[in-house]
From Swiss-Prot:
Organism from which the protein derives: Homo sapiens
Predominant subcellular localization, coarse grouping: cytoplasm
InterPro entries: Kinase-like_dom_sf, RIO-type_Ser/Thr_kinase, RIO_dom, RIO_kinase, RIO_kinase_CS, Ser/Thr_kinase_Rio3
Protein's name according to its UniProt entry: Serine/threonine-protein kinase RIO3
Protein family per UniProt: Belongs to the protein kinase superfamily. RIO-type Ser/Thr kinase family.
Gene: RIOK3
Length: 519
């Protein structure tokens, strides 16, 4: 053995494993490997490992028991296999049900394949879409207690402890339990933990009321969708209000400011009305949107205000209920226009769209002007308000030829030191068959309010009626006064039927007080 290096055998010498054969008959030269080179390579490798150990210290690894095949937990694998098998079985059962349904068809006699199903005994509740809560409800306080049955003989107990089926306590508890059978919309309350007892009379009344409300809600379901009974905003009304905002006429609608029996008033900020005409209306900065309710529940008893009005008499009987409500809005628009021309403080009409009337807002910064009923006035301001009201009533009667017909402290606003009149949808002309009666009622409301307010100069209702109308009815009591008013109305109605409305005008050309009939 050569210590210097290991050399390959010469070409002529045969190797121990046999001569190497080359397919091209060319001998291969074996590269000689020196022992010194091998040792140098090993030394360099050791030095490299030492340097790496110095730069990257070895992290101590906690020694622990090696995981062997005996310690591996295979329960998850078993569960996975069971779940896969359950899915396969469910698919098989579903296919079996389809085959069963196809095999039976529409036959009245069917054959069941249930015995061939692959159902697991531990199949959980997830197999069905409807989850079932298997909690114990034996002690559930919200579960209605099972009533104690009464035997056929009709009583329980003996002697003094006998209890019949007509016992007040037993019947009261049974009636309380029966309230759970009412419709879900009927709120019966929560009686958990309380021993409630209802008498038969009370239970029967509640039962009848619940049934009647259920029938009523079912009957008015569709009508409610098309009415404005609640907040006066149905889908059609919302669409109209949306179009007003979308067109730019209104900038925004802030909210409701007043609610009444016949209408609801909303506050809105005015926009700009783009119109090619030069005389287009200027929209105020703040507007009031009056929406008339489209149900006739509140208008059935108020048709006398519009049925006998000559301006709408011919149109009233030809319209459906919804168009009658539009007529109310149109009537208020015309009345406000008359008052505006006469210079009476009132809202200015901006736009009328079906049963929606847009007017100027009386107030400031979304705060409406207070009513005379709500405002606190001193004696001088109250006296000034009375004289303004008296002047407005005379001006409304003579210059506008109108009677408010619902004038009271609730329909008069106090703003900027003046009295403003609102809500004139029911106002009629004095030629109305009941025009003078409405005027007398207005005088009564105004007189009583200011007399209670401490205005000593306030006239009585009969004196105020004569002062406003210009008539001189001398009657000692109210009954005779009303009788003369009805007689004048009857004579005026006959005169109108014979000679027409123009011949029975209340205003003379010479400015004298109005007359109900020609003398």
């Amino acid at each position: 053995m050569d210590l210097v290096g290991v050399a390959s055998p010469e070409p002529g010498t045969a190797a121990a494993w046999g001569p190497s054969k080359c397919p091209w008959a060319i001998p291969q030269n074996t590269i000689s490997c020196s022992l010194a080179d091998v040792m140098s390579e090993q030394l360099a490798k050791e030095l490299q490992l030492e340097e790496e150990a110095a730069v990257f210290p070895e992290v101590a690894v906690a020694e622990g028991p090696f995981i062997t095949g005996e310690n591996i937990d295979t329960s998850s694998d078993l569960m996975l296999a069971q779940m896969l098998q359950m899915e396969y079985d469910r698919e098989y059962d579903a296919q079996l049900r389809r085959e069963e349904k196809k095999f039976n068809g529409d036959s009245k006699v069917s054959i069941s394949f249930e015995n061939y199903r692959k159902v697991h005994p531990y199949e959980d509740s997830d197999s069905s879409e409807d989850e079932v809560d298997w909690q114990d409800t034996r002690d559930d306080p919200y579960r209605p207690a099972k009533p104690v049955p009464t035997p056929k003989k009709g009583f329980i107990g003996k002697g003094k402890d006998i209890t019949t089926k007509h016992d007040e306590v037993v019947c009261g508890r049974k009636n309380t339990a029966r309230m759970e059978n009412f419709a879900p919309e009927f709120q019966v309350g929560d009686g958990i933990g309380m021993d409630l007892k209802l008498s038969n009379h009370v239970f029967n009344a509640l039962k009848q009321h619940a049934y009647s409300e259920e029938r009523r809600s079912a009957r008015l379901h569709e009508k409610k969708e098309h009415s404005t009974a609640e907040k006066a905003v149905d889908p059609k009304t919302r669409l109209l209000m949306y179009k007003m905002v979308n067109s730019g006429m209104l900038e925004t609608i802030t909210g409701c400011i007043s609610t009444g029996k016949e209408s609801v008033v909303f506050h809105a900020y005015g926009g700009s009305m783009e119109d090619e005409k030069e005389d287009s209306k200027v929209i105020p900065t703040e507007c009031a949107i009056k929406v008339f309710k489209t149900t006739l529940n509140e208008f059935k008893n108020r048709d006398k205000y519009i049925k006998d009005d000559f301006r709408f008499k011919d149109r009233f009987s030809k319209l459906n209920p919804r168009k009658i409500i539009r007529m109310w809005a149109e009537k208020e628009m015309h009345n406000l226009a008359r008052m505006q021309r006469a210079g009476i403080p009132c809202p200015t009409v901006v736009l009328l769209k079906k049963h929606i009337l847009v007017m100027s807002f009386i107030g400031h910064d979304q705060v409406p002007a207070p009513k005379l009923k709500e405002v606190k006035l001193n004696s001088e301001e109250m006296k000034e308000a009375y004289y303004q009201t008296l002047h407005l009533m005379r001006q409304l009667y003579h210059e506008c030829t109108l009677v408010h017909a619902d004038l009271s402290e609730y329909n008069m606003l106090w703003h900027a030191g003046k009295v403003w009149l609102i809500d004139v949808s029911q106002s009629v002309e004095p030629t109305h068959p009941h025009g003078l009666e409405f005027l007398f009622r207005d005088c009564r409301n105004v007189s009583q309010f200011f007399q209670k307010g401490g205005v000593k100069e306030a006239l009585s209702e009969r004196e105020l009626f004569n002062a406003v109308s210009g008539l001189n009815i001398t009657a000692d009591n109210e009954a005779d006064f009303l009788a003369e008013i009805e007689a004048l109305e009857k004579m005026n109605e006959d005169h109108v039927q014979k000679n027409g409305r123009k011949a029975a005008s209340f205003l003379k050309d010479d400015g004298d007080p109005p007359l109900l009939y020609d003398e």
